[in-house]
């Protein structure tokens, strides 16, 4: 019997099922959105709860710790409590903790509520993936996975836009309150559509609690290292060294134990399957570039162009909105084109958008970023759906939950590592370029002296901020100083030197960002290799067989 005959006999998908899928996808979208939307308003949140500096970064870190721990646990806990109960309760708690975050008065409260928000919101991501694979027939998996790709790629891109607008228009608490309206719609949709299944509390007695504890400790320590490492000079800090050792020991022991446990909390054996293992590696590298690029662009605009949160968000929208046009077409492409080829094309296009930013300069702002952002949007939109589909080929329905948790955790982990990597890479490359430029700019060089002289004349005409001994000036400037008094030529030489130094730093900063985009382009090109080694599947339907 042919696949076409199977599809012809397949019963139509009930409306109730589509409502369940839509509600689950809305939840996954909110969970991913809450990573980027908060980062945009972070300086304002820090001011609102009277904190800042290195401590303020814990507002983001806390959410990520909760999320990265619960994602791989979701399959096990949904079996214990049933998908319906587990999803509904966590959705309600996610909304509650969102409100509590908006009401937080100090950093301690905010960290607590953000951990709990991440722990409940993280459930929404893998369960949306599981519901697609378990409730939709194989022929409709591509459509469901296309919807899921919107949550995975569109949400990080549009998050800064929404966060910037809400913060500037209504204040920082609204970056948390925005979850309420769609969250209530999601609750109603899932309450109506998800089937009731029995609980299995007996699984708690047989639970792999040793593995759960090791995984939670290891992932929490690793996430903290990734978020704080650059600020604390990585292994130059005893704090980072200790956390790294804890993460390494806990995760290594966890991995070893999971292979020898009869009922592991995370089924790592799935990674031995060619398509799932290679697909998960590709997903990890995609997450690396996806989240790192979403981090880099607003940073570049803020640091080099002086953009505020709303202005940076408007530029990021160019990366998000085109995806809404492309993603619905991807299931149609998958019917006619090998999924591996689609993923490869998407990765090439995504990498091209990164390489387009190699020519950054001081005038490279919103208009110049339009086409790289649009190209990036197209690449991201093409990649996610076929990658998810072909990675799930050979995964049985009973394994869908375990595969979903592992697959999505690796993308999130890739994003955390990618963001930390580009932060550190930028710091090192900025220092490198600053050193090289300074080595070629000397006060003994005629061009440098001429530039400083021009700047001195400019500051004499327009005024300068600091004071300087007029004896330090030269030629006509010194005579002018003697005639007018030191106050008349306040600080012109120092102002000129500072201006030259600022130009050097600005150029080194821009070159550092360009190098980061080059790094992401190389990572995306490298991601093509595991994709090329995948076996050809039967499309999204392969996940069900």
Residue ranges: model-predicted function:
Residues 133-136, 191-196, 226, 255-260, ...:
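Structural signal for the C-terminal ends of transmembrane alpha-helices
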Residues 117, 121-150:
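Cytoplasmic helix-loop-helix junction between adjacent transmembrane helices
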Residues 15-79, 84-93, 98, 102, ...:
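Transmembrane core module of solute transporters
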Residues 176-191, 215-218, 243-250, 515-532:
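Symmetry-related core transmembrane helices of the 12-TM Major Facilitator Superfamily/SLC fold
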Residues 147-149, 155-160, 164, 293, ...:
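Small-residue-rich alpha-helical segments with characteristic i,i+4
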Residues 1-28, 32, 275, 454-545:
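Transmembrane-helix exit segments and adjacent C-terminal regions of multi-pass membrane proteins
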Residues 180-222, 229, 234-242, 265-272, ...:
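Central mid-sequence intracellular linker of multi-pass
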Residues 52, 274, 278, 288, ...:
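Loop-to-transmembrane-helix entry motif
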């Amino acid at each position: 019997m042919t696949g076409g005959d199977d599809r012809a006999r397949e019963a139509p998908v009930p409306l109730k099922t589509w409502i369940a899928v839509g509600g689950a996808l809305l939840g996954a979208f909110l969970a991913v959105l809450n990573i980027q939307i908060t980062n945009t308003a972070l300086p304002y949140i820090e001011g609102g709860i009277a904190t800042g500096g290195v401590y303020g970064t814990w507002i983001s870190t806390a959410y990520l710790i909760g999320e990265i721990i619960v994602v791989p646990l979701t399959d096990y806990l949904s079996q214990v409590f049933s998908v319906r109960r587990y999803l509904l309760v966590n959705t309600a708690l996610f909304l509650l903790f969102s409100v509590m975050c908006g009401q937080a008065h100090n950093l301690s409260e905010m960290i607590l509520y953000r951990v709990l928000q991440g722990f409940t919101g993280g459930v929404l991501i893998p369960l949306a993936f599981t519901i697609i694979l378990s409730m939709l027939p194989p022929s409709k998996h591509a459509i469901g996975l296309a919807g899921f790709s919107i949550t995975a790629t569109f949400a990080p891109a549009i998050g800064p836009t929404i966060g910037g607008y809400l913060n500037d228009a209504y204040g920082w608490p609204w970056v948390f309150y925005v979850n309420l309206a769609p969250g209530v719609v999601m609750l109603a949709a899932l309450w109506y559509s998800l089937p009731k299944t029995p609980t299995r509390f007996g699984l708690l007695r047989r639970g792999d609690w040793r593995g759960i504890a090791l995984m939670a400790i290891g992932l929490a320590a690793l996430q903290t290292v990734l978020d704080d490492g650059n600020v604390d000079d990585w292994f130059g800090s005893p704090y980072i060294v200790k956390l790294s050792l804890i993460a390494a020991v806990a995760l290594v022991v966890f991995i070893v134990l999971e292979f020898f446990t009869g009922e592991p909390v995370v089924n790592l054996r799935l990674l031995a399957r060619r398509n799932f293992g290679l697909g998960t590696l590709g997903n990890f590298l995609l997450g690396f570039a996806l989240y790192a690029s979403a981090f880099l662009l607003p940073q570049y605009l803020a640091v080099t162009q002086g953009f505020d949160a709303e202005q940076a968000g408007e530029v990021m929208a160019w990366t998000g909105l085109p995806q809404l046009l492309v993603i619905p077409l991807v299931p149609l492409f998958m019917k006619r084109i090998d999924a591996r080829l689609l993923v490869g094309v998407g990765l090439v296009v995504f990498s091209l958008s990164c390489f387009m930013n190699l020519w950054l300069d001081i005038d490279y702002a919103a208009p110049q970023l339009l086409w790289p952002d649009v190209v990036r949007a197209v690449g991201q939109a093409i990649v996610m759906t076929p990658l998810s589909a072909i990675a799930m080929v050979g995964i049985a329905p009973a394994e869908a939950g375990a595969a979903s948790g592992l697959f999505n955790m690796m993308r999130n982990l890739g994003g955390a590592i990618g963001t930390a990597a580009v932060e550190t890479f930028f710091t090192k490359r900025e220092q490198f370029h600053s050193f090289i430029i300074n080595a070629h700019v000397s006060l003994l060089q005629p061009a440098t002296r001429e530039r400083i002289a021009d700047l001195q004349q400019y500051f004499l005409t327009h005024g300068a901020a600091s004071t300087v001994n007029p004896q330090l000036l030269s030629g006509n400037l010194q005579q002018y100083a003697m005639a007018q008094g030191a106050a008349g030529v306040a600080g012109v030489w120092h102002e000129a030197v500072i201006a030259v130094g600022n130009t050097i730093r600005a150029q080194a900063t821009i070159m550092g960002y360009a190098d980061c985009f080059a790094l992401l382009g190389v990572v995306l090109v490298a991601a093509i290799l595991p994709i090329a080694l995948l076996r050809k599947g039967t499309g999204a339907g392969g996940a069900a067989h």
